[in-house]
Amino acid sequence: MESSNLYSKLLNAPKNTPVFLSQNLEADFIVKAYTFGLFPWTSKPVTWWCPDPRCVLNPNQIHIQKNMKKFINLYQIKLDYDFLKLITLCRDARSQSWIDDEFITTYYKLFTQGYAHSLELYENNELIGGIYGLILGKVFFGESMVNIKKNASKVAMIKLCDLLKPYDFIIDCQVYNQHLEFMGAHNISRKEFLNILKEKCNQESGFKNFKDLIT
């Protein structure tokens, strides 16, 4: 299907239900799908979503609550250090998770290809939280966050925003929740989101390697 036809179909797709189903997750298809605002959520079959409205966060608009300031520099930050361990932790920390073995295998492949990235938090060399997602152009497509220690996921988002601020990024948070709203995220229409992707996914990120943003 041509890009223009897919764009038109997505504008009229269901707002709060899957747009379509697939039997398997394929790394190459995921990269293409993300540029059209689609993301997988649950497997067997894989459900593909493009919700309307869409929750996004501008790194320059991150809200840092007063009670968070004491946590910001409490943990060591590492980038792309142990992606596999972080995504596994995101799965294991939840009693019910869409992140199954197929998700882990596929997203780890995307990591080895340079698309998927992780920001990890450590305390005494122990992984205690973080966030992972895909970077395409100037968009960070957030997939999942986790915290083992108090406020670790919030610190991860704050640190991610700090790193991406100089590069005019937008962070895709997928679906609204109060936790994200407190941090400065907000909803926009699907049409506005897809227009942002048209522009930003075709731009250079502005840096060579994500992991080198922390020296």
UniProtKB/Swiss-Prot annotation:
- Please verify whether the record's keywords include Methyltransferase: no
**Where is this protein localized, as stated in its record?**
Cytoplasm
Keyword annotations from UniProtKB, A to Z: Acyltransferase, Cytoplasm, Transferase
Q: Name one Pfam family in it.
A: Leu_Phe_trans
| UniProt GO cellular component terms | cytoplasm
EC annotation from Swiss-Prot or TrEMBL: 2.3.2.6
Instruction: Spell out the disulfide connections.
Output: none
* A Gene Ontology biological process term: protein catabolic process
What this protein catalyses is: N-terminal L-lysyl-[protein] + L-leucyl-tRNA(Leu) = N-terminal L-leucyl-L-lysyl-[protein] + tRNA(Leu) + H(+); N-terminal L-arginyl-[protein] + L-leucyl-tRNA(Leu) = N-terminal L-leucyl-L-arginyl-[protein] + tRNA(Leu) + H(+); L-phenylalanyl-tRNA(Phe) + an N-terminal L-alpha-aminoacyl-[protein] = an N-terminal L-phenylalanyl-L-alpha-aminoacyl-[protein] + tRNA(Phe)
Q: Which GO terms describe its molecular function?
A: leucyl-tRNA--protein transferase activity
Highest taxon, organism lineage: Bacteria
What function does the entry list? Functions in the N-end rule pathway of protein degradation where it conjugates Leu, Phe and, less efficiently, Met from aminoacyl-tRNAs to the N-termini of proteins containing an N-terminal arginine or lysine.
Q: Which family does it belong to?
A: Belongs to the L/F-transferase family.
Q: What is this protein called?
A: Leucyl/phenylalanyl-tRNA--protein transferase
